[in-house]
Structure formats: C-alpha cells, structure tokens
C-alpha cells in the first residue's frame, strides 16, 4: 500500500485551510479554521488576518498530524497570491507560505505554489469530477467577498491561465451580502444566515432589472436598494430573497450575453457566494454549469492539494 501523502495550504482573508490527499487523488482531510471577526464588523484588516493565520496554524497542523500518522509527506502546495497575474499580492497569504517553507526545510517533500483563484477553480473541478474541463476552454466565475470576476480559463501546465473578461466594477458579491447582513443584525460573514432568511420567504420577490454592460456590472446599487427595502419593511426574509434574486439575475444576464457572442459554454462557479443554493438552482435550470458542494465552494485548501497532486504526478 502506498503511504505517500500530499498537502495543500490556503490562508485567505476568511479561513486558515489545510487539506491532505493521497498520491492517487483521494481526499483524506479538508481542515478549516475560520478567522474571528468581532460582532458588527465586516471583515479583517490584512495585518489582523495574517496574525490569526499564524495563531491558527499550529492547531490546524496538529489536526493534520492525525491523518499523517505512518505516512510520508511527499509534496506541499500553497496559495501564495490572490490571482495568477503579475503584481497580485495580499499579506494574508504569507501565513501559508511561511508554513510551507517550514515544512519543506524539515522534510524531503517538494514544494509547489499556485494562486488562490486557481485553487478555487480546481476545488470545483475536483468536487464535481469535471476533469474533462482541462481539455477545453470554459468560463469561470470567482464569487466571494474579495473577488467577483468572470474569466475565460484554459489549462496551463499543472494549473490554469485565465483572462479577465468581466465582473463587478465596484463592490464584490460577498461584500454586498455581508454588508446587508450586518446591516440587518446578522453575524459576519453573513452568507449562510442570509440564505436561510431568503429561503424562509414564501411571497413574491420584487424584481429590479440590473444594468449590465456586456459582462460587466455594478453591485453598489444593490446594497442601496436592499437597505432601503429593509428600512421600509423591516422584513429580513424579503430583503434577503431580493438580494439573491438580484445577484442571480446579474449572473444570468452575463451568461446569456456570453453565449450570444460565443455559443454554448460551460460556466464554472467557485468562491463562497457560489455555495448559495438559490443562485445555483436558478442558473442550473438555464445553463451548463459546474458547482461543487458548499465546502468546496467556500475557501478551502482542497483545490491547492489537487493542483499539487497534479503537478507532482506530471513531474514523474
């Protein structure tokens, strides 16, 4: 029996994540430690996020150790930057890089580095078992609190190359969700609570047509509309349902525009906002879409582990 194991590490602005995988691609562990955010606040400064990653890392590595017992660590991958473009940088990823370098210095494991965004894309491919996407061009949406981008994606080596073709021109989808949630008294991050509120609403959802410029859009208007709706109605469920209906309409419109220009396309959705069942069900009924389970849509290290597995095997 092969006892070799691969590790992935991701230190985003929300979660410290470590994943372990066998050298034949079987997931052993998907470990996460969320970063604490004070009640009423809407996120963390980068310096605070890095501090909490450093604080979280020993305990999450202790949890990982349980899965490493009797096994040999042969490769460690890490997300070292937000996106696969020159100059992409966020201090929070230094926490993961430091952990990886420490492991590489004390073991014979090989090291690999990727972008956080490539990790998200790979996590969805791995979770949905859509490995056929490595042989074709597809469109990926990275929807989170820090990013709302529409990308044309192709395979490049062990990972991906991507071209930014659309997305938000102001607020990110996750930002809007969190701002409205906190405004209504929900805890940060507010996505799960806001989704529960939306699903509890049984009435007709008022619709407001979003303004789309081919593949680009603005979401600050949604924040203003939702806050006014809540001020006028004091109805959390109605407001939550409106928010997710609006976001679904935005994504539906840009997907329609893309297919009008390029023909039938596979649309992949990653990032924490992509775990929302309302958005998923709306788009699933209209397009060829790829979603992963919520645990692989939100920040995780499974995508990084899977990319590391792929890179390690390509070198053999």
Where are these regions (language model features)?
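Glycine-rich beta-strand-to-loop/alpha-helix junction loops that act as flexible
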Residues: 78-81, 144-146, 268-276
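Conserved active-site "lid/cap" helical segment
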Residues: 17-80, 229
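Conserved phosphate-binding catalytic cores of ATP/NTP-utilizing and phosphoryl-transfer enzymes
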Residues: 1-4, 109, 113-138, 307
């Amino acid at each position: 029996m092969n006892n070799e194991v691969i590790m992935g590490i991701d230190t985003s602005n929300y979660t410290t994540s470590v994943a372990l995988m066998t050298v034949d691609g079987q997931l052993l562990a998907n470990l996460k430690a969320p970063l604490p955010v004070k009640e009423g606040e809407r996120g963390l400064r980068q310096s605070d996020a890095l501090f909490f990653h450093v604080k979280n890392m020993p305990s999450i590595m202790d949890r990982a150790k349980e899965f490493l017992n009797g096994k040999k660590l042969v490769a460690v991958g890490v997300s070292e930057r937000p996106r696969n473009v020159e100059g992409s940088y966020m201090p929070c990823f230094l926490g993961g890089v430091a952990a990886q370098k420490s492991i590489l210095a004390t073991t014979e494991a090989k090291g690999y580095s990727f972008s956080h965004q490539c990790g998200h894309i790979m996590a969805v491919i791995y979770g949905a078992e859509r490995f056929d996407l490595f042989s074709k061009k597809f469109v990926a949406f990275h929807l989170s609190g820090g990013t709302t981008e529409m990308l044309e994606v192709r395979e490049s080596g062990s990972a991906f190359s991507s071209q930014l073709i659309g997305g938000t021109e102001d607020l990110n989808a996750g930002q809007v969700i969190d701002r409205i949630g906190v405004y209504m008294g929900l805890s940060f991050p507010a996505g799960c609570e806001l989704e529960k509120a939306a699903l509890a609403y049984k009435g007709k959802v008022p619709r407001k047509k979003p303004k789309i410029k081919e593949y680009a859009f603005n979401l600050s208007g949604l924040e203003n509309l939702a806050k006014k709706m809540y001020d006028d109605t004091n109805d959390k469920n109605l407001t939550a349902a409106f928010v997710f209906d609006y976001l679904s309409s935005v994504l539906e419109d840009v997907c329609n525009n893309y297919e009008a220009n390029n023909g039938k396309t596979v649309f992949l959705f990653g990032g924490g906002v992509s775990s929302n069942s309302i958005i998923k069900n709306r788009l699933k009924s209209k397009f060829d879409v790829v979603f992963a389970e919520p645990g692989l849509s939100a920040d995780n290290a499974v995508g990084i582990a899977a990319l590391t597995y792929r890179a390690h095997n390509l070198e053999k």
